[in-house]
Amino acid sequence: MRKNFSLFEQLDNNINTIDEIDNCIKITLGPTGKNGITYGGKDELKFITSGSLLMKALDFPNSASNVILKLLEQASIKSYKISGDGSTTTILLACQLLKSALKFLVHGYNSVLISNGLTKIAYFLSEKVLEFSVPISKVSE
């Protein structure tokens, strides 16, 4: 059986998936963040305070949505391994970048140009972080 595929329909589905992930994770952000609640079956409720743990608990019925979820989860894990914190912020920033990029694709922009632009932004922001950073020489600092 032949399956109909629409690129714009898939892009809209991806944007909706990213919105759902963003809405689930942003409740845990910051010192006043709220707990997420997951249902594990057998009347088992879990309260989750971390955005990265909440990401691991999410699951979508659509395989394309799960791919996006796993990509964002990998970004949050890498951020946590490097800095020990910031996984929720990484997820939210990545969601916003992906939503913006997908909206540009829907409007007909070239994906290579979007990718090159995001790479330039990453290098620029890395340089700014290094410019404003202060070296630490002692553990007490």
What is each PLM-predicted segment?
Residues 1-141:
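N-terminal glycine-/lysine-enriched basic segments
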